Amino acid sequence: MTAILQMRNVRKLYGDHVVVDNLDLEVQPGQCFGLLGPNGAGKTTTLRMLLGLTTPASGTLMLCGEPIPQRAPQARMRVGVVPQFDNLDPDFSVIENLRIFGRYFGLSSAQIAERVPKLLEFARLESRADAQVRDLSGGMRRRLTVARALINDPDLLIMDEPTTGLDPQARHLIWERLKSLLSAGKTILLTTHFMEEAERLCNHLCVIDAGRKIAEGKPHELIDSEIGCDVVEVYGDELEPLRDTLTPLAERTEMRGETLFFYVREPAPLLAALHGKGGVRYLHRPANLEDVFLKLTGREMRD
């Protein structure tokens, strides 16, 4: 199977600063591929190189069978892009935004007339077709941005932080719409800071930091290999003495702020020891992708 996207030994520098460092990526048709990393990891620069908007210092890139940046305009005709921030035209209605974008891709009036009603239905905006963009909620604008990115029936949909700033209801509706695209065979490249989003949608992940790949695999494989046990979060006062006492019951422990994390393969003894402890609260849960991300990239704030 021919990959829709390939990067081989791609490097990008700004001055003497290495932003992307010999990065390899490969996205197969039908995948939802998650590109994860903290702020400053190189995700945005990677996307810009893939689209031919900035040139790598070295390495090779292929997008939809086209070499990048040499044939980036041709490749972009087969790609849909959902940017991190909406760039809809506020002077036009919902339906006009879709029609105008269709013309950018050279679609005929007949093609636009056929596709627009289906995209309005996909975005659940049929009743708001004539509404002005400025009158839409944030969730509606985001759904319209996704629908607009599909106007050219792209081989690859690139989504940069697709649900940032949305409330939980709007976020779940976007997830449901994206799952319907994946069920229909679409290919998605996704960046996100919501680990739940990546765990729900992606069937393959790559974690980068400081421009380098530090982990890759399926979400459940990364959770098993990097964490491999349950997590008990403990909140309260005087956690250090509790840590000293209960550490033998855990594979490892970690203190961050006012939370003590126990990583345990057999949680029952630890839970029994915590039961009835005054001044503490605790939560026992399975390990998740956020645990993996924080283990790999650290818990320090990134600007």
Swiss-Prot record:
ATP binds at G37, P38, N39, G40, A41, G42, K43, T44. Keywords: ATP-binding, Cell inner membrane, Cell membrane, Membrane, Nodulation, Nucleotide-binding, Translocase, Transport. Residues 5-235 form the ABC transporter domain. CDD domains: ABC_subfamily_A (cd03263). It is an enzyme of class 7 (translocase). InterPro entries: AAA+_ATPase, ABC_transporter-like_ATP-bd, ABC_transporter-like_CS, ABC_transporter_ATP-binding, ABC_transptNodI, P-loop_NTPase. It comes from the Bacteria. It is a peripheral membrane protein. Its EC number is 7.6.2.-. One of its GO terms (molecular function) is ATP binding. One of its GO terms (cellular component) is plasma membrane. It is found in: Cell inner membrane. The keyword Transport applies. Part of the ABC transporter complex NodIJ involved in the export of the nodulation factors (Nod factors), the bacterial signal molecules that induce symbiosis and subsequent nodulation induction. Nod factors are LCO (lipo-chitin oligosaccharide), a modified beta-1,4-linked N-acetylglucosamine oligosaccharide. This subunit is responsible for energy coupling to the transport system. Belongs to the ABC transporter superfamily. Lipooligosaccharide exporter (TC 3.A.1.102) family. The complex is composed of two ATP-binding proteins (NodI) and two transmembrane proteins (NodJ). This is Nod factor export ATP-binding protein I. It comes from Cupriavidus metallidurans (strain ATCC 43123 / DSM 2839 / NBRC 102507 / CH34) (Ralstonia metallidurans).
